[in-house]
Amino acid sequence: MKNNCTSLKSSIDEEDELKTDHEIDLEKGLLPEYDSKEEGALPLYSDHARLSNSPNTHRENNPSRSTDNSSPLLIKLLISFTSIILFNAPAVCYLKYKDAFFKNYGAAEWTLFGFWCLVCTLALIFLTYFYETWTKAVKVTVIFLAQCVKACGKGIKHFLKKWENMPMAFSEVFLFNIFGGALRIISRHFFGKRWGLKCSLADHIIFAILSILVFIAETVKPGSIRVNLIRKMGHEAKQQVNEYTAIPLHEMNPESEA
């Protein structure tokens, strides 16, 4: 029976099997010989060998990134303690100035001092535990204040550059107050205390509003309240000088007449 059995495989299938057995992977190279006697030995290109020889994890490849970047506990404690000392420094300086630092303390003073030490200790623990939170808050606050100061500086610089006549406006408001005060003193002398320095609140408010309006008007448009005689006289003098010193065209070009 064995000799009479014919194989179901065709000649084409046998050729394909021979080709696949003898094919060489150009990327992997020749397959090493597999020794079944060695325990645990697997072909290098098998799935189990790939799993066993898998590359290291991301943490093993990059050990520096796995380290904690947070500040050490000692540095946190030192910075928190320094902030508490700076907070208590004004009180200590005041007690030193009054010569009352640990002098003539009674039961109430020592109780208050112990309570304050307890509060400082709890604050130290709190600041150390929430170090990242409050330091970020302080940084944001400092940056915000710096930006506010910078913006205010730019605004003041722009204001002073644009409103160059503010000193004159201040001086005019000052003169206006002196003139108004003199009138009120004179009116008090002639018409009694009702119109003098002891006026009602409404009179003071009206006088303050008038002073503010004078300042704004003189700042926005110089000479709107006062008559700028100096500038006017200077402008007229320049015009007269230009008229007298102007040279006629025929004197400048005598050849044109000829």
Swiss-Prot record:
Keyword vocabulary terms for this entry: Membrane, Transmembrane, Transmembrane helix, Vacuole
Source species, domain of life: Eukaryota
Membrane spanning residue stretches: 73-95, 110-132, 169-186, 201-223
Cited InterPro entries: WTF (IPR004982)
Family label: Belongs to the WTF family.
Segments for region (Disordered): 1-21, 47-69
Summary of the function given for this chain in its UniProt record: Acts as a suppressor component of the dual wtf meiotic drive system, and can suppress but not confer meiotic drive by compatible poisons. Wtf meiotic drive systems promote unequal transmission of alleles from the parental zygote to progeny spores by encoding a poison and an antidote from the same locus; the poison is trans-acting and forms toxic aggregates in all spores within an ascus, wherease the antidote is spore-specific and targets aggregates for degradation by the vacuole.
GO annotation terms (biological process): meiotic drive
Protein's UniProt name: Meiotic drive suppressor wtf10
Lineage per the UniProt record: Eukaryota, Fungi, Dikarya, Ascomycota, Taphrinomycotina
Residue spans of biased composition, Polar residues class: 1-10
UniProt topology in membrane: Multi-pass membrane protein
Keyword Ribosomal protein recorded: no
GO cellular component, one term: vacuolar membrane
Origin species: Schizosaccharomyces pombe (strain 972 / ATCC 24843) (Fission yeast)
Cellular compartments annotated: Spore membrane; Vacuole membrane
Pfam families membership: WTF (PF03303)
Binding partners and assembly: Homomer. Interacts with other proteins that exhibit high sequence similarity.
